[in-house]
Amino acid sequence: MGPVIVDTNLLLLLIVGAASRKFIRMHDRLSRYDEADFNTLEMIISLYSDIVYIPHIMAEVSGLSRQIKNPARRKIQETFREFIEAATEVPLPSRDGARRSEFHRFGLTDALLLSLCSMNENGVEFSLLTADGDLAVQAEMLGYGVVNFDHWR
């Protein structure tokens, strides 16, 4: 399959779990997830050719990933840095999200995710991987490729 866009909470799970699976249960923002969820997430992502991110998601993950004490924080930040270096960034102007009709309901970042889903790069469409049920439904209604992570749990 083509590239996948991973939403904030799942990207946080991916980064924290990649640093150490034991950090998942230590991180307050990941209380609804466990190591099995991390394994499922890795399996789903492996089906795609690349992970694509937007700066807005990375800023959110950066702030959330730091909400744990050292030495875990340091290890997570190093893993996050490595991820940033390896993944593909697609810069989208905030105005693209603000101009979408979904902006008022979903906010800037999710509106930008939908905007990215609407793009077609050299015949390759982006798919969205999310744990946000409302966002998944909206993406599906718009005809975008979407995987609702909660359906895999």
Regions found by a protein language model. Give the residues of each.
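Acidic, PIN/NYN-like endoribonuclease modules and their adjacent C-terminal/linker elements
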Residues: M1-I5, A19, G97-F106, L114, ...
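PIN-domain endoribonuclease scaffold, especially VapC-family toxins
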Residues: V4, A36-G107, S115, M119-N122
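Short, well-structured N-terminal submotif of metal-dependent ribonuclease cores
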Residues: M1-Y53, I68-A72, D150-R153
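Alpha-helix capping/helix-boundary segments
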Residues: L10-L11, I57, L112-L113, D134-L135
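Generic detector of short, locally flexible boundary/turn motifs and exposed helical patches
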Residues: V16-S20, H27, E89-R95, L112-L113
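Residues that scaffold the ATP/ADP-binding catalytic core of kinase and kinase-like folds
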Residues: L13-L14, L64, Q138
